[in-house]
Amino acid sequence: MIQKLGAKGIKSDERNQREWDDGSEHDDVTKIYVRGGREGIRSIYFNYVKNGKPKDGSIHGYFDSGFTQTFEINHLRGEYLESVDAYYDKKSYGMQAIQFKTNFRTSELMGYSYECTMFTLAVQGKKIIGFHGSNYVHILSLGAYFISIAPTRLEVKGSKGSKKWDDGFDHENVSKIEVLGGFEGILYIKVDYIKNGKLETGLVHGHSGGDGFLQKMEINQSKNEYLVYVEGYYDDASETIQGLHFQTNLNNPVMMGYKKGRKFLLASNGNKIIGFHGYADKSLNSLGAYFSTTTPNKLECQGDRKGLPWDDGCNYDGVKKVYVDSISDIDSVRFEYDNGGKVEKTPYRRDVTNEKEFVLDYPNEFITSVEGTLATPTNFDITWILSLTFKTSKGRTSPTFGSSSPGRKFVLEKNGSALVGFHGYIGPGYNIKALGAYYRPIPPTPDVKRLEAQGGDGGASWDDGGTFNSVRKIYIGLGKNVVGFVKFLYYKNARVVIGDDHGNKTLSSDLLEFLLDPFEHIISVEGTYDDTSGGITMLRFETNLQKSPYFGFGTTSNFLLHKDNHQIVGFHGKSSNMLHQLGVHVIPNGFKFI
């Protein structure tokens, strides 16, 4: 049900005041444009998504001289707009500043809030899908439309050849899990929930009369504990789940059953499980889950919380690289994240003169802690960060960036968790005044392996990464006796991720395509390269369903990229105006990044 919050701000008696209304027929807000000037916010407009398609909003106010600030919301990754803080000044007769908050991060303050009155647009448990308000010379007032947040449903892993069951998703949390295991696998599962603040006893799904071993797991509601993922093991021959490994946000893992069979994962970007569904009869044949969003797990800033705030957000899978600029103290820090399979590098926040890198072996390695030193406060109670050191899940420690001067130590760490996003403050001197982080439990090891690239000499290295679910489509461009260009489209979190161009597309006379079905995956790549040109001259792909045509020149291979019982989920290599080398990332059959 849609809920409308009335517009707040300045009520004007001017005849020229214009009221506007974008309506509530949207799925999400995707981008916000705010245009400000010396006298406040002059105009604002919003982009939406409706029925899965983009919809541009109208400009409200005067789009004339001034500056425009934007804030994008990645609805494809489950991000949505939760609330708005706005500031108005009756003396200057208009809105002066505005700030937006999603379920993952907070925008910078757009405008100036000095000596202003603040109001907030927010409804607990709901998201914003539309705006309305009024304007004259400035934006005068703002209101919003809200709707309840729908849970994410992950389909069952396993077989569907028995009785279907569904506990639903109208719960606040899981309370207790009970599993009966036997020699043939999991015989039944029973889950109790918290609904409307009260305990709801679940039903038995499977066969409760058999012999076996009973295992139980309780979720500690008083400590705000919740399930973040389930790792399961499924036997194709018996069509029965053999084991279930449950993981909570407090890093309390419980294994029920056996680690036998094909591995699968039920997870949704750090969200919490609020319900299960599946198929069962004489045993548990499959399992799926419902997820709801959670409040970000946030480690507060250490240091001086004065200056300009910045917030990378927490909607990332992990950190791939750290950049630190330092001559004596820490002048700047920024990060390269994995955002749903795409590399996202945070922007420069100041000029850098001595930037150094710390590279992680992601997705097999995560940042687990940051140790820092703060300068001794001055007479004006001012401090800043002197040094930073990063530690990883593989036991590695980065070099210490910054100054070796003594100061107050601090640590950003949550036991058993990975740091997946950062926030902080920049001081008037544009050095780092404070640093905080977002964390989530370290995901199960994906067992990603990197098979070295094969081919000739030359070219610059590239790497699409290996955290995708599968390959969707391949483009191959052929030049003069050589493969001149390749490009890969991948599946990640049920959406298509477009890889970068590798090689020279414009020099390729023929552009060929190889399209895979949604349940098809690549198991090997064979090819040929020419020692004289250093370029690859032929490629052929084999999937679990078919072999592709020969792309290029010739049919005799001199290299093969393959690992038994694994599937290819990403590519790397070298290229210039042609493709010189090609390598792959592989994961065990049955494992998927969710």
UniProtKB/Swiss-Prot annotation:
Domain of life: Eukaryota
Domain Jacalin-type lectin: 2-148, 151-293, 296-441, 448-588
Pfam families linked to this entry: Jacalin
Gene3D superfamilies: Jacalin-like lectin domain
Chain spans, region Disordered: 1-23
Comp. bias intervals (Basic and acidic residues): 10-23
Keywords: Lectin, Repeat
A molecular function GO annotation: carbohydrate binding
Family note: Belongs to the jacalin lectin family.
Protein name per the record: Jacalin-related lectin 44
Species annotation: Arabidopsis thaliana (Mouse-ear cress)
